[in-house]
């Protein structure tokens, strides 16, 4: 008998699908996160959400705001677990200066795109984003529907 292949676990913890729908993503950067122990355990259990999260700058540092990490039910009682606390992003000074300059342009913001594991470290992919207008969103939907229709036509043509 052959051995069954072990399933490879996905490294992705959470995705922000709404960001790609609501914004044009100009640039993407990988950043580390400063986390507490209970947050790491909760993220390993898949209890993280970055749906409405974005990046703010305070005192020359970047922080992830709006991300939610729900504590496990078996978490210690002597530690106060705040699921929505702001978490510091670990970036070098050159990246911070570049992001700060780009974010201060008119109409640009920085949003969290995905949260994932890279080895033993939790990373967040952040993107420099510009808001989409309603007609841009409709155009994206039309393009997506046309791609599906085109693929269906090609598949049926090959069957023939």
UniProtKB/Swiss-Prot annotation:
The keyword RNA-binding applies. GO terms for cellular component: cytosol. Its main location: cytoplasm. It holds the Pfam family SmpB. GO terms for molecular function: RNA binding. It is found in: Cytoplasm. One of its GO terms (biological process) is trans-translation. Keywords: Cytoplasm, RNA-binding. Belongs to the SmpB family. Required for rescue of stalled ribosomes mediated by trans-translation. Binds to transfer-messenger RNA (tmRNA), required for stable association of tmRNA with ribosomes. tmRNA and SmpB together mimic tRNA shape, replacing the anticodon stem-loop with SmpB. tmRNA is encoded by the ssrA gene; the 2 termini fold to resemble tRNA(Ala) and it encodes a 'tag peptide', a short internal open reading frame. During trans-translation Ala-aminoacylated tmRNA acts like a tRNA, entering the A-site of stalled ribosomes, displacing the stalled mRNA. This is SsrA-binding protein. It comes from Histophilus somni (strain 2336) (Haemophilus somnus).
